[in-house]
Curated annotation (Swiss-Prot):
Disulfide bonds: none annotated. Its EC number is 6.3.3.3. Homodimer. This is ATP-dependent dethiobiotin synthetase BioD. It comes from Neisseria meningitidis serogroup C (strain 053442). Substrate binds at residue 42.
Length: 215
């Protein structure tokens, strides 16, 4: 594993932040040089909350790259999708600033995990979806799903979008923290999605996030 990877989810609040932090921690334990980035954070000021969670999970203090703003290049105060948060803050989202920050991190670290906002179809601007940006940059995707009711549908829609856009799926992360309270639904979702991943993206990895990984 080397390079820049985009961490997305099948929905908002699906566990991307914890998954990103846990994956970064595992890579650190393997001796890898890794950093996480939250290119667009909404609902915050000055510091990206998700980056703080990443560092806590990784067992690391805020890094020099964090202090330089490279890991959180765009922060908006209103908790909404980036296109709306930018409009309400009265300024445009600077895609060049984000691209440059990611490139600088990639030059310093072996692996950069870029956590997106929401799912693949979340608008970054009025004219650009998150999935458009991922395709433009050529990033492989790490997709976070769960065992809660509706996850099969949302995951298959995400699979279809990735195929349509010609984007490589690196791995599917099944988040047990957000499992359905119904054990039958949770287990069936896991079994079904594991089979579909093998059928639809045979080279992609299957990963699981345990309940004990909850922050």
């Amino acid at each position: 594993m080397k390079g820049v990877y985009f961490v997305s989810g099948i929905d908002t609040d699906i566990g991307k932040t914890v998954a990103t932090g846990v994956l970064a921690k595992q890579l650190l334990q393997q001796g890898k040089s890794v950093i996480t980035q939250k290119p667009v954070q909404t609902g915050c000021q000055n510091i990206a909350d998700d980056i703080a969670v990443h560092r806590k999970i990784m067992g690391k203090p805020m890094q020099e790259a964090d202090k330089q703003g490279l890991t959180m290049p765009e922060i908006f105060s209103y908790p909404a999708s980036p296109h709306l948060a930018a409009r309400l803050d009265g300024r445009a989202l600077d895609l060049d600033k984000i691209r440059t920050a990611t490139q600088q991190l990639a030059a310093q670290y072996e692996i950069v995990l870029v956590e997106g906002a929401g799912g693949l179809m979340v608008p970054l601007t009025e004219n650009l979806l998150t999935i458009d940006y991922i395709r433009q940059q050529g990033y492989p995707v790490i997709l976070v799903t769960s065992g809660r009711l509706g996850s099969i549908n949302h995951t298959l829609l995400s699979f279809a979008a990735l195929k349509q856009y010609g984007i490589r799926l690196h791995s599917l992360v099944f988040n047990h923290i957000h499992d359905s309270r119904d054990a039958h639904i949770a287990q069936d979702s896991l079994n079904y999605l594991k089979c579909r991943l093998k059928a639809d993206f045979s080279e992609a990895e299957w990963m699981e996030l345990a309940k004990t990984d909850a922050v």
